Amino acid sequence: MKFEVEKARLKWLLDDQYEVLKKSRAILAGGCVTSLFTNVEINDFDLYFRDKEGLSTQIAGMFSQEYGYYQLHHLTNKALMYIARGSDNPCQLIVFDFFKDAHAVFDRFDFTANMAAFDFETEEFVFHEDFWKDLSARRININPKTDYPIITALRVDKYKQKGYTISKAQYLKLMLMINSLEIDSWEFMRDQVGGMYGYSFEEIFKPQDGEEFSIEKAIEKIEKLSLIRERWYDKPAEFAGNNPEIKEIMEKWKDILHEKQIGWYNSKNVERFNQWTQIASSYNEADEGGIDWLDSVVTNPFDKE
């Protein structure tokens, strides 16, 4: 199956971003691809990367002529979400790990009905063996290897509202997965509940000075506070991922990404941008006009200086 109609629609939706994603060899996966095949409105694009070069190329591409200008929506230790100028669909770069192929991404997903991907390296769709049958039956089949089962539990309710069903056996499996987490610190608790799938509850579990962790205290915090989405754009996010290569990339880009949270590209960052990554320079030198586009940034209408 070639899925030429779906490929054409994807190109139309991504517009100029499509070529940048090809260069970064990204993998588009999850609900966005499911929505593409069920003719449902796409809310956002979840993008995964094979290696350091791919992620660096993608971030550099955001500043290129091909992308135009973008605005950062949020930055956590798991994901970076931005909205390209002129686009209605945010893109979320998954930055907590690298993935060699689409099936490596599926290994970390929670529902088989979302295990569909588009590989920009091959420009082909990839599917888990259970994807079509669970999607057609609107059935929640949980992957026991998923990274964040607490978030999965929250997503079960969301998918039930969409008409999906979950068996008692699957729900019990999910409860046992959560029970096996052995949550023993505020840091681990925050890691389990924040920064993915649009759920950001980390502020709730920030301890007071010297406050020791306990499940009872965590429950008290939930009872005292409404579950609110954290406003990531209020301040720079500290990247605390475990992968050292990803952490290196995100720490280098943190300041410039934060400026994007409060406005469009500022020419003060041009010098830092050139120094920070050779990937950025090599990417732009490969384009017509080299890196001359940086000179035009100073006078573009979005420049706040």
Describe the residue ranges of each PLM region.
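Catalytic cores of the polymerase beta-like nucleotidyltransferase superfamily
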Residues: 1-305
